[in-house]
Amino acid sequence: GREDERDLFPEAIRLVKEMHPRAAMFENVRGFLDPKFTDYREHILNSIKELGYKTHIKLLNANDFGVPQLRPRVVIVAIRDDIKAEFQYPDGCNSNTPSVGEALKELMGANGWSGLNDWVNQANKIAPTIVGGSKKHGGPDLGPVRARMAWAELGIDGTGVANEAPSRDFSGTPKLTKEMIALIQGFPSEWTFGSKKTAACRMIGNAFPPPVAKAVGIEIRRCLENE
């Protein structure tokens, strides 16, 4: 909402006003659709429309796009009024989304951990939502108590972030590395983060999952090419 320190809608709308692109995309948390934000949501959409854009809004789930994480996000797409083609959101029904264990098996076993297979069997669901950093969520860890309990069910210690994968004789509940967190967020395995651990985890946790962004971007491009 208007009072949230993380609200970047005013800046994003300012950029649209100054640059007047053919299309723009915005994303926000699922709570943006809550009834208590109806007035603010309409204010944002009307502000975009007043700049000469048609607006589209939809809730997309990252796990429908192959991301092994529960991450629903509201995606707003604005198409300039002179573009006549109609924008369509991607379907995103991906039945091949891996579990956390399947996605992280190679990274978690990088140091020959003897307990790997048992862990993979336990981590047989998608991950809870990865959090970034703010005054409410510091780092590096995997979120508040309720989130850590969800991670614990997957055999993951959410109280911190490890520097490397478990050793061969490791006994206990492993922590994720920043590379593992990035993979769960949908980043390619070759992607590197030059920052220190806390800053890197904050960037990763605040990111919009790349596979979802790509899918929406492809549909925006299709709309612009067909106009």
Each predicted region: which residue ranges?
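C-terminal target-recognition/interaction regions appended to catalytic cores
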Residues: 108-227
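Class I S-adenosyl-L-methionine
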Residues: 1-152
